[in-house]
Amino acid sequence: MILYFSGTGNSKYVAQRMAEALNQSLLSMNDRIRSHDTSPVETDERLVIVTPTYAWRIPRLVRDWLLETEFPGAAQAWFIMTCGSEIGHAGRYNRSLCQAKDLTDMGTAQIIMPENYIAMFDAPQAEEARRIVAKAQPDIDRSIAAVREGRPFPPPHDRLYDRFMSGPVNPIFYACFVKSSAF
């Protein structure tokens, strides 16, 4: 099962690639989150969660929905996070989420896609966006291969900067810049 949350299409694109390559069903979390639908989602043992990066972690509304929703059959979870430049130390928080859900954490992959957080950054022009998406293909392919083979994603780098951005900066950045009023 491939679950995805997408606001601008980057995560949806990656999730669709994963679902097609792995012959897995695809479920958008957007409508379920919007309607507060936390009814159980039947899955096989492999659960792939594709989300954008909000302030160097998965979006809080996605985290909360995942915590409230049961996934009968799921035993392992892989996280794939799309971002404009980096996901910080998000894997640590995804591991904690897996522990809370009694799932084996299979790691977090970072897929750099066109920047779309236009409140603070310039979105790339069309040609640059196409170049970024083309450059992301090998990372998407590696993620597909890992899930297909049941392998964990390689551990990301573990720098003080990443821990700082996903840790103390996250709540400040979230309070000042992240809005989810559409949900």
Which residues does each predicted region cover?
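FMN-binding flavodoxin-like domain, especially the glycine-rich phosphate-binding loop
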Residues: 1-2, 6-13, 20-32, 37, ...
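Cysteine-centered iron-sulfur cluster-binding motifs in ferredoxin-type domains/subunits
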Residues: 181-183
